């Protein structure tokens, strides 16, 4: 196993390292790990990961994938396998980082299929029991011999269920991330206790319309494939589809989930007789997904701020989310936040061009905007019922010095629908990182 150091992944910083967990609680019946197999050029960074169901019974799986037209080969292969098996009997995930295997033609498809074939073989899985994912530079073929040689080594020598195994797995899927993103949680449904573990990668090319990055949820709860798919889609819409770093949607973005039932209890499905257990699990996974997705924003390439856009009292959830997304993806707003400039006109501009459902979705005379500090101190009104406030620039500057900030928009429609969206600022460092990404 490999200790996480500043050299384990690109740009690991003292600031970011505070988000790396020192311990965790992990679901029963899984083995995970990560190694360096040679995809990344530095000769040492972890670049190959496996998550395996070891419970002995077929797991349920679900997935949500990018809508980018240039879907990478692993996205196409994984979608096909998931559909063919109706989500039942997917028992492992295999992931490489450092190369996206995207826009790589027929060879890319063969390489993705071979990664599945070799993984299933070394893990003694039935055929097509693994989903495959890749992340990294677009347009280059995989060094497939290195990957296919690394899979047996990883499977036989480096899989386990300790905290370090999970950290290795989370580290091995990183590209421009500054820290591995790993979250765990234990919760109860009735008399049954279950555990969730989630890991993801993402720091750039983050934009809604799922998927937005690579992410993996695994649990020891017993869940049917159809219920897991429905819950995952609902959770992703309120988490990973509610974040933005730079407005780019990747060719490879994938969120997958696996439930092996190792903790026992009544099987959770999406029928009326199981509504209470289903609702409880959905609530847990939504909150869990939001926590994990927010780590991606905190690790936004070059980011210095974590910004929550909170839209309240919209006519519909769709309107609330669309307006929040419009603000979060505004480069003018994001650069103003980096410059600690309370230029609230940029917020109103983004509200005004948001894609909303009706002419009554945004009424300027009813719209209010304010900065809300997360430290509990007084908020700062910028606009109240369409009327601009005399902004205390000194107070605004004080609020904008903080790393975390809430921008709250109240539409005053009496529709009562709310949405949160998470974003970061846009800095000089973002250009620096992406200007030499392939070097």
Swiss-Prot record:
<keyword id="KW-0496">Mitochondrion</keyword>
<feature type="binding site">
    <location>
        <position position="439"/>
    </location>
    <ligand>
        <name>substrate</name>
    </ligand>
</feature>
<feature type="binding site">
    <location>
        <position position="301"/>
    </location>
    <ligand>
        <name>substrate</name>
    </ligand>
</feature>
<feature type="active site" description="Nucleophile">
    <location>
        <position position="212"/>
    </location>
</feature>
<keyword id="KW-0068">Autocatalytic cleavage</keyword>
<comment type="similarity">
    <text>Belongs to the ArgJ family.</text>
</comment>
<feature type="site" description="Cleavage; by autolysis">
    <location>
        <begin position="211"/>
        <end position="212"/>
    </location>
</feature>
<feature type="binding site">
    <location>
        <position position="434"/>
    </location>
    <ligand>
        <name>substrate</name>
    </ligand>
</feature>
<dbReference type="GO" id="GO:0006526">
    <property type="term" value="P:L-arginine biosynthetic process"/>
</dbReference>
<dbReference type="GO" id="GO:0004042">
    <property type="term" value="F:L-glutamate N-acetyltransferase activity"/>
</dbReference>
<comment type="pathway">
    <text>Amino-acid biosynthesis; L-arginine biosynthesis; N(2)-acetyl-L-ornithine from L-glutamate: step 1/4.</text>
</comment>
<dbReference type="InterPro" id="IPR002813">
    <property type="entry name" value="Arg_biosynth_ArgJ"/>
</dbReference>
<dbReference type="InterPro" id="IPR016117">
    <property type="entry name" value="ArgJ-like_dom_sf"/>
</dbReference>
<comment type="function">
    <text>Catalyzes two activities which are involved in the cyclic version of arginine biosynthesis: the synthesis of acetylglutamate from glutamate and acetyl-CoA, and of ornithine by transacetylation between acetylornithine and glutamate.</text>
</comment>
<comment type="subunit">
    <text>Heterodimer of an alpha and a beta chain.</text>
</comment>
<protein>
    <recommendedName>
        <fullName>Arginine biosynthesis bifunctional protein ArgJ, mitochondrial</fullName>
        <ecNumber>2.3.1.35</ecNumber>
        <ecNumber>2.3.1.1</ecNumber>
    </recommendedName>
</protein>
<dbReference type="GO" id="GO:0004358">
    <property type="term" value="F:glutamate N-acetyltransferase activity"/>
</dbReference>
<dbReference type="GO" id="GO:0005759">
    <property type="term" value="C:mitochondrial matrix"/>
</dbReference>
<keyword id="KW-0055">Arginine biosynthesis</keyword>
<feature type="site" description="Involved in the stabilization of negative charge on the oxyanion by the formation of the oxyanion hole">
    <location>
        <position position="136"/>
    </location>
</feature>
<dbReference type="InterPro" id="IPR042195">
    <property type="entry name" value="ArgJ_beta_C"/>
</dbReference>
<comment type="pathway">
    <text>Amino-acid biosynthesis; L-arginine biosynthesis; L-ornithine and N-acetyl-L-glutamate from L-glutamate and N(2)-acetyl-L-ornithine (cyclic): step 1/1.</text>
</comment>
<keyword id="KW-0028">Amino-acid biosynthesis</keyword>
<feature type="binding site">
    <location>
        <position position="201"/>
    </location>
    <ligand>
        <name>substrate</name>
    </ligand>
</feature>
<dbReference type="GO" id="GO:0006592">
    <property type="term" value="P:ornithine biosynthetic process"/>
</dbReference>
<dbReference type="Pfam" id="PF01960">
    <property type="entry name" value="ArgJ"/>
</dbReference>
<keyword id="KW-0012">Acyltransferase</keyword>
<keyword id="KW-0808">Transferase</keyword>
<feature type="binding site">
    <location>
        <position position="175"/>
    </location>
    <ligand>
        <name>substrate</name>
    </ligand>
</feature>
<keyword id="KW-0511">Multifunctional enzyme</keyword>
<feature type="binding site">
    <location>
        <position position="212"/>
    </location>
    <ligand>
        <name>substrate</name>
    </ligand>
</feature>
<feature type="site" description="Involved in the stabilization of negative charge on the oxyanion by the formation of the oxyanion hole">
    <location>
        <position position="135"/>
    </location>
</feature>
């Amino acid at each position: 196993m490999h200790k996480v150091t500043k050299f384990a992944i690109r740009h690991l910083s003292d600031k970011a390292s505070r988000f790396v967990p020192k311990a965790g609680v992990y679901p029963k019946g899984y083995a995970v790990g990560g190694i360096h197999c040679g995809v990344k050029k530095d000769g040492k960074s972890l670049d190959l990961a496996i998550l395996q169901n070891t419970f002995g019974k077929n797991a349920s799986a679900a997935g949500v994938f990018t809508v980018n037209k240039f879907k990478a080969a692993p996205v196409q292969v994984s979608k096909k396998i998931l559909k063919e098996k109706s989500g039942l009997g997917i028992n492992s995930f295999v992931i490489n980082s450092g190369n996206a295997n995207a826009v790589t033609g027929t060879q890319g498809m063969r390489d993705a299929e071979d990664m599945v074939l070799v993984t299933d073989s070394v893990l003694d899985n039935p055929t097509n029991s693994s989903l495959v994912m890749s992340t990294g530079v677009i347009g280059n073929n995989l060094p497939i011999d290195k990957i296919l040689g690394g899979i047996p080594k990883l499977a036989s020598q480096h899989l386990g269920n300790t905290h370090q195994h999970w950290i290795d797995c989370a580290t091995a899927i990183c590209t421009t991330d500054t820290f591995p993103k790993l979250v765990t949680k234990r919760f109860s449904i009735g008399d049954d206790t279950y555990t969730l573990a989630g890991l993801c990668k993402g720091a750039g090319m983050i934009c809604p319309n799922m998927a937005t990055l690579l992410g993996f949820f695994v649990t020891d709860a017993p869940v049917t494939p159809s219920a897991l798919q429905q819950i995952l889609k609902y959770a992703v819409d309120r988490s990973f589809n509610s974040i933005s770093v730079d407005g780019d949607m990747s060719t490879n973005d994938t969120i997958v989930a696996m439930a092996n039932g190792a903790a026992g209890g009544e099987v959770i499905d999406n029928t009326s007789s199981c509504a209470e257990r289903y609702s409880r699990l959905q609530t847990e996974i939504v909150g869990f997904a939001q926590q994990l997705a927010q780590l991606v924003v905190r690790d936004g390439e070059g980011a210095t701020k974590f910004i929550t856009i909170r839209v309240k009292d919209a006519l519909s959830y769709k309107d609330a989310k669309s307006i929040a997304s419009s603000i979060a993806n505004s480069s003018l707003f994001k650069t103003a936040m980096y410059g600690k400039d309370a230029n609230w006109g940029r917020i109103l501009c983004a509200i005004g061009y948001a894609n909303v459902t009706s002419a009554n979705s945004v009424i300027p005379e009813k719209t209010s905007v304010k900065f809300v500090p997360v430290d509990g101190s007084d908020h700062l009104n910028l606009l109240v019922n369409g009327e601009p406030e005399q902004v205390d620039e000194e107070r605004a500057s004080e609020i904008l010095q903080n790393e975390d900030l809430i921008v709250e928009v109240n539409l005053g429609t009496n529709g009562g629908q709310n949405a949160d969206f998470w974003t970061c600022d846009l800095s000089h460092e973002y250009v620096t990182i992406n200007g030499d990404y392939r070097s």
